[in-house]
Amino acid sequence: MSHTPTPAAGSGHAPANGHMALVIGAIGVVFGDIGTSPLYTLKEAFSPHYGLTSDHDTVLGVLSLAFWALMITVTLKYVTIIMRADNEGEGGIMALMALTQRTLKQGSRSAYVVGILGIFGASLFFGDGVITPAISVMGAVEGLEIAAPSLHPFIVPITVVVLLVVFMVQRFGTEKVGKVFGPITCLWFLSLGAIGIWNIVDAPEVLKAFNPWWAIRFFMEHGWHGVFILGAVVLAVTGGEALYADMGHFGARPIRHGWYFFVLPMLLLNYLGQGALVLNHPAALKNPFFEAVPSWALYPMIILATLAAVIASQAVITGAYSVARQAMQLGYIPRMLIKHTSRDTIGQIYVPGINWLLMVMVIALVLIFRSSTNLAVAYGISVSMTMLIDTLLLALVARSLWPRWRNWVLPLCVVFFIIELAFVIANGAKLLQGAWFPLALGIVVFTLMRTWRRGRALLREEIRKDGIRIDSFLPGLMLAPPARVPGMAVFLTADPMVVPHALMHNLKHNKVLHERNIFLNVDTLPIPYAPADKRLQIESIGDEFYRVYVRFGFMETPDVPLALMRSCDQGGIHFDPMDTTFFASRETIVASANRGMPIWRDKLFALMHRNAAPATGFFRIPGNRLVELGAQVEI
């Protein structure tokens, strides 16, 4: 069903030992978010906010809803179907958007709508990324209340300290500690299953929740109020989208096997165990997860839950770095400083700007909401909307790329859409109670991304409009050629057909040309990694002038000097970094009320442009080989 063979790690038939290592690694990274959902899902479903009683039919109804949500949304949609919609092995909403746009006519209304959906979905991811660390860590630390109620005043301070440590150590990378994430998370899931079995033996009738009749009966008894309970049920599937987003790191097979044969059974056992406890001891509703733990294992379980929450937070934070890098490469957010934290693993990066923004917002959330129950009210809306967008994009992929399978995938997409629309409606009812926060954050990020994208387009238009075409400029220049100096000049340009401002300034003030001159355009392809045969394209335009295109995938960190060094000799240009000067224009944006965007967006774009990391640093151009020349552009 996949449109192309996927080169993602683990997608082939790896040796058994290697495959098992990938499965354990995936358990440590991919399933962290969904693995901490038992900490708060049933606790939220039976909170006073929803007014449910703990009678037999209601408990079985809620358990049945959670079971079928996991089976339909996570197992069927994400693990079985959508993970086949890979973009050269990569997953996630940005990769899915780029894949979908490749099936549509460039510049068409459909491509525009898909772009809007993808950007909004990525924006909502950051809302989810703020809440997940807060609710996971706080839900784990709240276990202390069960062990020692007198510790209640210390729950928030302890949560803040744990989160501060998590964010402060990001700059050191996770290469070393990441090796223990898998075993710790495996122990966490085994503990979930063991706790579940411990309680199920006391009330085995909870196994009847596998029958969908109990979910249907729940809606029949509770009517529209039953729909709103889905606002709590959706917490059981939060993190399901991470299985697809992290596919490029581990491959589809290890993630599928980890889910089918280990993670899903352990989660189901734990939810059923909590339900069994509630049937026998309704007072356990205050915190059914920790009440289900035997007293002798309570403190070890609190420690293990906190470690699992930290690992889940780590997965979301690194996921935010990855999405931010993809968005930068695809031109949706300003360039930011990216640091590599591993010499061996290219995907391990640290983005300081994203890290500190997340830290401030996560800690602010903890201080404002002060409990996992209050945070659960805010949770879910962004996840539900992201899942809904994934379904719409999946339908487009199935229609265009899967002719053999579309007749059964498209009807399933209708089922997914109805379920996820119900999740969105249920969470929308909590807007005033706190669900507004991730939605508002998503809208802010969406506005920033759209403003940056549109502003860059307007900037290119202005430069092109005021510029001189190279094909008409060079013949005139060669009629009275300026003096030539030894070496090579590389002029970075967004439009290689127009004379760069930096060249015009150099001629005006220095009145010289280098022996060899390159007009360099750096482009990002809508695929994760640029193939070697598309990495570099060289065109000779006469008199030792060359037009060079360097291309990268959206998962790559651009290194222009390295790309030139590896490829230029093949195109007949000798590239010596020590004999090359890079020239770049640094535009100053002047906002105008009479141009393409409202004045407030012009000013916002100017602010973002002013604070963006210079293209030269982003492209790894050495500062001692760089000349930057300013230019003022009105948009």
Swiss-Prot record:
GO terms for biological process: potassium ion transport. Disulfide bonds: none annotated. The keyword Nucleus does not apply. It is a multi-pass membrane protein. It is found in: Cell inner membrane. Keywords: Cell inner membrane, Cell membrane, Ion transport, Membrane, Potassium, Potassium transport, Symport, Transmembrane, Transmembrane helix, Transport. It comes from the Bacteria. The chain crosses the membrane at residues 20-40, 62-82, 111-131, 149-169, 180-200, 223-243, 259-279, 292-312, 349-369, 377-397, 408-428, 429-449. One of its GO terms (molecular function) is potassium ion transmembrane transporter activity. InterPro entries: K+_transporter, K_trans_C, K_trans_N, Kup. It catalyses: K(+)(in) + H(+)(in) = K(+)(out) + H(+)(out). HAMAP family: Kup. PANTHER family: LOW AFFINITY POTASSIUM TRANSPORT SYSTEM PROTEIN KUP, OSMOTIC STRESS POTASSIUM TRANSPORTER. Transport of potassium into the cell. Likely operates as a K(+):H(+) symporter. This is Probable potassium transport system protein Kup. It comes from Xanthomonas campestris pv. campestris (strain ATCC 33913 / DSM 3586 / NCPPB 528 / LMG 568 / P 25). The gene is kup.
